[in-house]
From Swiss-Prot:
This is RDS3 complex subunit 10. It comes from the Eukaryota. Involved in pre-mRNA splicing. Required for the SF3b integrity and prespliceosome assembly. It is found in: Nucleus. One of its GO terms (cellular component) is nucleus. It comes from Saccharomyces cerevisiae (strain ATCC 204508 / S288c) (Baker's yeast). It holds the Pfam family SF3b10. The gene is YSF3. Belongs to the SF3b complex composed of CUS1, HSH49, HSH155, RCP1, RDS3 and RSE1.
Length: 85
């Protein structure tokens, strides 16, 4: 019983610390968006990863790649890209 209470306490702490975990009412789409945003945030936050992404995209500067990753995290950005074409 003590182990179960410990696990519930840890789960509560992790949910407060890592918002992307969600809860019972989190939909699949919300969870996927959280994971995607966490990944993009990690890529733009670590210089080595950012440099790798910049090279793979063919961008001339790391700054352009960082801006693209940050814009990609906003919900309306995909609609903006579709309108641009």
């Amino acid at each position: 019983m003590a182990e179960k209470q410990r696990q519930l306490k840890l789960q509560k702490i992790y949910k407060q610390k890592y918002i992307g975990l969600g809860d019972e009412s989190t939909t699949r789409e919300q969870w996927q968006r959280n994971v995607r945003n966490d990944t993009l945030n990690t890529l733009q936050g670590h210089s080595a990863s950012l440099e790798y992404v910049s090279l793979s995209r063919g961008d001339l500067s790391i700054r352009d790649t960082r801006i693209h990753l940050l814009k990609s995290m906003s919900p309306g950005y995909k609609a903006y890209l579709r309108e641009e074409r």
